[in-house]
UniProtKB/Swiss-Prot annotation:
Alphabetical list of PANTHER family matching this protein: ARGININE--TRNA LIGASE, CYTOPLASMIC (PTHR11956:SF5), ARGINYL-TRNA SYNTHETASE (PTHR11956)
Species in which this protein is naturally found: Aeropyrum pernix (strain ATCC 700893 / DSM 11879 / JCM 9820 / NBRC 100138 / K1)
Lineage: Archaea, Thermoproteota, Thermoprotei, Desulfurococcales, Desulfurococcaceae
Subcellular location: Cytoplasm
Keywords noted in UniProt: Aminoacyl-tRNA synthetase, ATP-binding, Cytoplasm, Ligase, Nucleotide-binding, Protein biosynthesis
GO BP of this protein: arginyl-tRNA aminoacylation
Protein's name in the database: Arginine--tRNA ligase
MF (Gene Ontology): arginine-tRNA ligase activity; ATP binding
């Protein structure tokens, strides 16, 4: 009876185990080097055997011969090992392999990510947007990457904990809350008056209040250009929002004796958990989180835990870190504030710890300054609170690893935090947390500034994409049910945005072209959804597959063979994408597979195939490809569509 593990994963496991043992090489090295050869004529799988055989007691020929016997013992009669030019090449007998795959498909098996033999508990913290305005394009990329990572790691067999860090402490949350205090309205009341989501209303109040404060302080400094800039922004904000609330905020800020002093005092009181600041700021931030949850729900993203920054302060965790720093030999003063001497930690701790040095890689030319912990006014910095949060994530979950999805602009602070943890004795945490950074994303001709209230919200982007999708679905399905059109267009829009923000790789800046990411002829999610729908249509027209009649030898034909083997690689491809934290590799694989499928079925009809054995075999191939594309899309947060 065929194993429930897919054939290629089973083969890969046997090869990795045997070669690792006989060559005395770490299994992970073998697994990484086992790959399709550069040229098809070499075979279906290859390994640089001579590179390692020279230092082993066995000859390369004897290793290959012994391997052949091992494979037969394990029932793998469809894989033939050969030795050519120092390489172990494996050639698949597609007739025998097809027979095994057909039996699996008949039993209900579908390809899925190969499970790890070493499952871990992994925290993925992502999105964690500042709760003072709606989610924007940058957050969309963060969410798309973070959720794809979580899905991949979970599919790989890891225990994944998704966390959102609520950044409610600091100046920005106070400024937004001050605006509501001065205006006399609540976030929900204002949202109702403006006819917008509550997070959009808070974003508007934050921008108005920030620029009102900026006008006052710039006038005191005599900075006329800043005054003019703030007034220009305020004029535009007035046109976009509630004029009565706008006038109240402006008048109230103008009448304050010391507006900046008031902001600082509110910050200090909130850090201490004093009323009425505690209820005011918590109320405003909670309202924004309502808007976040609505948007993220639409985007297909959810979280296991929402961690409030203020809770870390009020629980004493932040003070514990500060006290540990005060007792540390690395305590110093920097810019009249207490700090940790990061350069000294690098010299005296990192440089003497080879494992830490190889894990926490420092850019050669980067000068890393001390990490300030507490300002001269007694308030903490966000990096201090991040230190406490880093420890908290490990302790509360028992995590083996923590992955923080945070923008590339935070590389220096994130590096400082890891080094500070190392210096304070939190070595395990420092070595097992990762800054998963990503570059910016923009729309052509649109600039972003939350302080000016200028940003492309994720809500707006999804509406733009959906409107275009509705028109496309309507044109392809005249007279279709309206609810189905709306539902399908929504899935296309969400999938298009998510896929476009993952596919290029995290370190490539993106300029998002909404028309292009929806194009069925481009490397897009809609193209993959269309391919999936096309496969569904073929299978519907074909009817039930009779696997007893399906003739696996018919898959030996060139393009069929290539497509068959490529589809069977999915469990290993997605496993490697999970291990490498590279969802873009899975995206590239799916596009390549879809290209192969679309090229094949247009030239080699399934429905009109005259020979019954080949027709059922080709239908089974369509089902295999459809299953792979569907599972791959789901791992990237894109919903497959039976019809478009």
């Amino acid at each position: 009876m065929a194993s429930s593990i897919d054939p290629l994963t089973r083969l890969h496991g046997i090869l990795s185990s045997y070669l690792s043992e006989v060559l005395g090489v770490d299994r992970s090295v073998v697994e990484r080097l086992l790959a399709p050869p550069p040229r098809k004529e070499y075979g279906d799988l290859g390994f640089p055997l001579m590179r390692f055989a020279r230092s082993s007691n066995a000859s390369a020929d004897s290793i290959v011969e012994s391997l052949r016997g091992k494979l037969w013992e394990r029932g793998i009669t469809w894989a033939s090992p050969t030795l050519e030019a120092g390489y172990l090449n494996i050639v698949f007998d597609v007739e025998k392999l097809g027979d095994e795959v057909f039996r699996l498909l008949a039993s209900g098996w579908r390809p899925s990510t190969a499970r790890t033999s070493r499952p871990e508990t992994i925290v993925v913290e992502h999105t964690s947007a500042n709760p003072i305005h709606p989610l924007h394009l940058g957050h969309a990329r963060n969410s798309s990457l973070g959720d794809a990572l979580a899905r991949l790691l979970e599919a790989r067999g890891h225990r994944v904990n998704r966390r959102f860090y609520v950044d409610d402490v600091g100046r920005q949350a106070v400024v937004a809350s001050l605006g509501f205090k001065l205006s006399g309205v609540t976030p929900r009341e204002l949202a109702s008056r403006m006819g917008v989501k509550v997070d959009h209303a808070v974003g508007w109040v934050y921008a108005v209040t920030h620029n009102a404060l900026e006008t006052v302080t710039a006038r005191k400094r005599g900075d006329t250009s800043k005054v003019d800039e703030a007034l220009s922004t305020l004029a535009r904000l007035k046109e976009r929002g509630d004029r009565e609330v706008f006038d109240r905020i402006l008048e109230a800020v103008g009448s304050l004796d010391d507006p900046e002093g008031l902001v600082s005092e509110m910050m200090r009181k909130y850090e201490r958990g004093e009323e009425p600041e505690k209820s005011l700021i918590r109320g405003v931030v909670s309202a924004v989180l309502e808007g976040f949850r609505e948007t993220l729900g639409r985007f297909g993203v959810d979280f296991d835990d929402w961690d409030w920054e203020s809770d870390l302060l009020w629980s004493g965790l932040v003070n514990k870190i500060i006290e540990e720093a005060r007792r540390s030999p690395f305590l110093t003063t920097h810019k009249d504030a207490i700090a940790l001497d990061i350069p000294r930690i690098v010299r005296e701790v990192l440089a003497r710890d080879p494992e830490a040095a190889s894990t926490i890689k420092l850019p050669r030319s980067l000068e890393i300054p001390p990490l300030i912990l507490v300002r001269s006014d007694g308030t903490t910095l966000y990096t201090t609170r991040d230190l406490a949060y880093s420890v908290y994530k490990f302790r509360v979950t028992g995590a083996d690893r923590v992955i923080n999805v945070i923008g590339a602009d935070q590389r220096l602070p994130q590096l400082q935090i890891r080094l500070a943890l190392l210096g304070l004795g939190y070595r395990r945490e420092a070595l097992n947390m990762m800054h998963y950074d990503y570059e910016i994303v923009s729309l052509p001709g649109r600039r972003m500034s939350s302080r000016r209230g200028e940003y492309v919200t994720l809500d707006e982007l999804l509406e733009m994409a959906k409107a275009r999708s509705v028109r496309e679905v309507e044109s392809r399905n005249p007279g279709a049910d309206r609810d189905w059109i709306e539902s399908t267009a929504e899935k296309i829009a969400v999938g298009a945005v998510r896929f476009a923000l993952v596919r290029p790789g995290r370190l490539k800046p993106i300029t998002l072209d909404v028309e292009r990411i929806l194009d069925l002829k481009e490397n897009t999610a809609p193209y993959l959804q269309y391919t999936y729908a096309r496969a569904s249509s073929i299978l519907e027209k074909h009817g039930e597959i009779d696997y007893l009649k399906a003739h696996p030898a018919s898959l030996e034909e060139g393009s069929r063979r290539e497509l068959f083997v490529e589809a069977l690689r999915f469990p290993l491809v997605s496993a490697k994408a999970a291990d490498d934290l590279a969802p873009e590799d899975l995206a590239s694989y799916l596009l390549r597979l879809a290209d192969m499928f679309n090229s094949w079925y247009q030239k080699d009809s399934v429905i009109h195939e005259e020979w019954e054995g080949a027709r059922h075999a080709k239908a089974a191939l369509v089902l295999l490809v459809k299953s792979v594309i569907g599972e791959g899309l789901r791992l990237l947060g894109v919903e497959p569509l039976e019809k478009m």
